[in-house]
Swiss-Prot record:
Originating species: Salmonella typhimurium (strain LT2 / SGSC1412 / ATCC 700720)
Residues binding Mg(2+) 2: 490, 492
Protein family membership: Belongs to the type II topoisomerase family. ParE type 1 subfamily.
SMART domains, per the entry: HATPase_c, TOP2c
Catalytic activity: ATP-dependent breakage, passage and rejoining of double-stranded DNA
Annotated keywords: ATP-binding, DNA-binding, Isomerase, Magnesium, Metal-binding, Nucleotide-binding, Topoisomerase
Top EC group: isomerase
Protein name listed in UniProt: DNA topoisomerase 4 subunit B
């Protein structure tokens, strides 16, 4: 590590180099499936805009993937500012694309102009063939660099247009170089469902199989297939749609009163949102509001019973498709929608449609209401049972714990908050129904070398154990009180130290919680940036620089505030940045069987008292990677 830090030490990454250096920031590096999805999304965007009727996908025997569409064809003319063919610009330059405005596509899944260029950056070779204006063009790239100029290789009919992208993923960037065929087929089938009338084919040359999908009544047919043979309520799915100038929503849903595997899929501009988001929240809220209104109007709600979202949502199977301009996603992989206005839009549309349906189908509606009321009554009985058990047999909960009222492990969350002042703000900012808060005083004990029999001697550890309902070193999670246990510490070095000690506690003494995916670390922002009435939050210096760069195009001077700790945030800011599921950032603490030994070795080196020499050597070797507050 060099001792001098001057202008020579500053690196500027250009072209596709940022992607090749940090591929995990741009795609899922488990398998190359996400690269395939990016190319498929481009072709489907053409279908969504009404310019394509067919998309063909071929998985070749050498694990390369080819996607062919009959859309307009990528532009091949020279870009007026950059002086290179547009197709070359699209593949070689991050943030170059035709989907930033609404001139070319009303709705699209491409937002940042990085999708196809990421495919190019992480592939050994990419070949693009464009049919446009009666000519066939070809261009090729290797390792993100152009190796063959755009050239005309043939002619075709004027109406014969489209694009073919054939790419060979670079296995050095992925845990496994092989495509998951089942996931690929699931994505393609979903695209066909969401684009009624568009034909999508998949040819698998590895397993010698072919598949074709084309749905005329997309969502209804798809949901009906998924629950075929199971008793449903109603018999035929409740379907609806609404199309506005800048937003559109389609849905199909039904309930499985006797249980069964639920299909729960959501999409934004045909992009699958595996983790849901604001559109799914809006669907749930709209159904709840309509059902509450129906029950109150018909006076069928027993005294003391109030329906909650989980009562109407518990056995609901649904497919939801939202189309909107400028959607905001949590992360580049677009697995969760965070656009706040979408929740209100979907909720309002669904509430009106479901209210109408309930009053037009009274018999089925009353059966649904009975099912929801029975769920609410079970929930109330379970809550009373839990309270009675606490008073008679179990240890009293810690006094500083501000508990929640819900019991559903799919929703309940416990936040372990650094400091009393931040704990007070968090108690005001939380949703009392499903979020519990427990403040911690200072740094907890380093428990890495403490036996599980002795660890409860620490009052803080004892309180955490009682609050979550699990004994140290126990694999029995039947008494677990919260589905998510979230570590919430300051974004500075002290906060990171506390978060590390808490992670060590869970990895060493509550390993079953970690292995079952119950432990999370919240990522509070370090900066708040204000420009007029617009507010932005940044987690790191790099994010702050990115936001400021983006704001240069707007009038006014941005005001930057650095949070010294969680205690500096008011309850509204704390809710928006760290507690609200729609806008916060959580990182799940996970340990796979393969990583077990490696995780133990790393934690032991960092936390064991006898390993000080190893720590010093590690710091000398890796110290230049540290992000320090100086």
């Amino acid at each position: 590590m060099t001792q001098t830090y001057n202008a020579d030490a500053i690196e500027v990454l250009t072209g596709l180099e940022p992607v090749r250096r940090r591929p995990g920031m741009y795609t899922d590096t488990t398998r190359p499936n996400h690269l395939g999805q990016e190319v498929i999304d481009n072709s489907v965007d053409e279908a969504l805009a009404g310019h394509a009727k067919r998309v063909d996908v071929i998985l070749h025997a050498d694990q390369s993937l080819e996607v062919i569409d009959d859309g307009r064809g990528m532009p091949v003319d020279i870009h007026p500012e950059e002086g290179v063919p547009a197709v070359e610009l699209i593949l070689c330059r991050l943030h170059a694309g035709g989907k930033f405005s609404n001139k070319n596509y009303q709705f699209s899944g491409g937002l940042h102009g990085v999708g196809i260029s990421v495919v190019n950056a992480l592939s050994k070779r990419v070949e693009v063939t464009v049919r446009r204006d009666g000519q066939v063009y070809n261009i090729a790239f290797e390792n993100g660099e152009k190796v063959q100029d755009l050239q005309v290789v043939g002619t075709c009919g004027k109406r014969n247009t489209g694009t073919s992208v054939h790419f060979w993923p670079d296995e050095s960037f992925f845990d496994s170089p092989r495509f998951s065929v089942s996931r690929l087929m699931h994505v393609l089938k979903a695209k066909a469902v969401l684009c009624p009338g568009v034909e999508i084919t998949f040819k698998d040359e590895v397993n010698n199989s072919e598949q074709r999908w084309c749905y005329q009544d997309g969502l209804n047919d798809y949901l009906g297939e998924a629950v075929n043979g199971l008793p449903t309520l109603p018999e035929k799915p409740f379907i609806g749609n609404f199309n506005g100038e800048t937003e559109a929503v389609d849905w199909a849903l039904l309930w499985l009163p006797e249980g069964g595997e639920l299909l729960t899929e959501s999409y934004v501009n045909l992009i699958p949102t595996m983790q849901g988001g604001t559109h799914v929240n809006g669907l749930r809220q709209g159904l709840l509001d309509a059902m509450r209104e129906f029950c109150e109007y018909r006076n069928i709600l027993p005294r003391g019973v109030k329906l909650s979202a989980e009562d109407i949502w518990d056995r609901c199977a649904y497919v939801l498709s939202v189309k909107m301009q400028d959607p905001q996603f949590a992360g580049q992989t677009k697995e969760r929608l965070s656009s706040r206005q979408c929740a209100a839009f979907v909720s309002g549309v669904v509430k009106d449609a479901f209210s109408l349906w309930l009053n037009q189908n009274v018999q089925a509606a009353e059966q649904l209401a009975e099912m929801a009321i029975a769920s609410a009554q079970r929930r109330l009985r379970a809550a009373k049972k839990v309270v009675r058990k606490k008073l008679t047999s179990g240890p009293a909960l810690p006094g500083k714990l501000a508990d929640c009222t819900a019991q559903d492990l799919n929703r309940t969350e416990l936040f372990l908050v650094e400091g009393d002042s931040a704990g007070g703000s968090a108690k005001q900012a939380r949703d009392r129904e499903y979020q519990a808060i427990m403040p911690l005083k200072g740094k907890i004990l380093n428990t890495w070398e403490v036996s599980s029999d002795e660890v409860l001697a620490s009052q803080e550890v004892h309180d955490i154990s009682v609050a979550i309902g699990i004994d140290p070193d126990s694999d029995d999670l039947s008494q677990l009180r919260y589905g998510k246990i979230c570590i919430l510490a300051d974004a500075d070095s002290d906060g990171l130290h506390i978060a590390t000690l808490l992670c060590a506690l869970f990895v060493r003494h509550f390993r079953a919680l970690v292995k079952n995916g119950h432990v999370y670390v919240a990522l509070p922002p370090l900066y708040r940036i204000d420009l007029g009435k617009e507010v932005y939050y940044a987690l790191t210096e790099e994010e702050k620089a990115g936001v400021l760069e983006q704001l240069k195009r707007k009038k006014g001077k941005p005001n930057v505030q650095r949070f010294k700790g969680l205690g500096e945030m008011n309850p509204m800011q704390l809710r928006e940045t760290t507690l609200d599921p729609n806008t916060r950032r959580l990182v799940q603490l996970t340990i796979s069987d393969e990583d077990d030994q490696r995780t133990n070795a790393m934690m032991d080196m960092l936390l064991a008292k006898k390993r000080s020499e190893d720590r010093r050597n590690w710091l000398q070797e890796k110290g230049d990677l540290a992000d320090l507050d100086v």
